[in-house]
Amino acid sequence: MQEYLEKRYALALYEIAEKNNKVDEYLRDLTDICDIFDENKEFYEVINHPKINTAKKKQLFTDLFKGKIDEELLSFMMILIEKDRILQLREILDQMEKIDLERRNTIRGIVKTVVPLLDEELEQLKAIFEKKYEKNILFDTKIDKSLLGGVYVKVGNDIIDGTIKSKVEEMKELMLKKE
């Protein structure tokens, strides 16, 4: 039920942002606000405190964000405070990012390697998956020394694990089965 509400809030906000041609701005601002929640425990505790009334919480947000974020985004935050859903902001942001990717015909993928890939290598991977999915691919690249070598790629439900670590684990399982 809660995820359903988060999707509805995200869709409503996305449509406002899209109408105002401010989708990227809203996503950036929401990310920054969520980071404030994560990094500032005192702020989080004030927002989460049951004895601090809604009016004070709204005033705190107004003082902090008025003039720094779009008025309609601030109004949206006020609604979340009134509905006692402001702490679901990260989930609403996640849903809004999914909506944005969908509307842009884009999906996210993960590429893990021991050393950074060259731009050409990343473009080749991207081209392969864009052809398969018929969508734009946005890769998050991560360096993972535990892989020992090779490459790990995850896009949607597809996983390509060409890492040395996975090959060693497969060999270990085979050897244990023979015993």
From Swiss-Prot:
Keyword Transport annotated: yes
Pfam families: OSCP
Places the protein is found: Cell membrane
GO molecular-function terms, A-Z: proton-transporting ATP synthase activity, rotational mechanism
Record keywords: ATP synthesis, Cell membrane, CF(1), Hydrogen ion transport, Ion transport, Membrane, Transport
Subunit: F-type ATPases have 2 components, F(1) - the catalytic core - and F(0) - the membrane proton channel. F(1) has five subunits: alpha(3), beta(3), gamma(1), delta(1), epsilon(1). F(0) has three main subunits: a(1), b(2) and c(10-14). The alpha and beta chains form an alternating ring which encloses part of the gamma chain. F(1) is attached to F(0) by a central stalk formed by the gamma and epsilon chains, while a peripheral stalk is formed by the delta and b chains.
Function, in words: F(1)F(0) ATP synthase produces ATP from ADP in the presence of a proton or sodium gradient. F-type ATPases consist of two structural domains, F(1) containing the extramembraneous catalytic core and F(0) containing the membrane proton channel, linked together by a central stalk and a peripheral stalk. During catalysis, ATP synthesis in the catalytic domain of F(1) is coupled via a rotary mechanism of the central stalk subunits to proton translocation.
Similarity-based family: Belongs to the ATPase delta chain family.
PANTHER family: ATP SYNTHASE DELTA CHAIN
Name of the molecule in the record: ATP synthase subunit delta
Organism field: Clostridium beijerinckii (strain ATCC 51743 / NCIMB 8052)
Source taxonomy: Bacteria, Bacillati, Bacillota, Clostridia, Eubacteriales
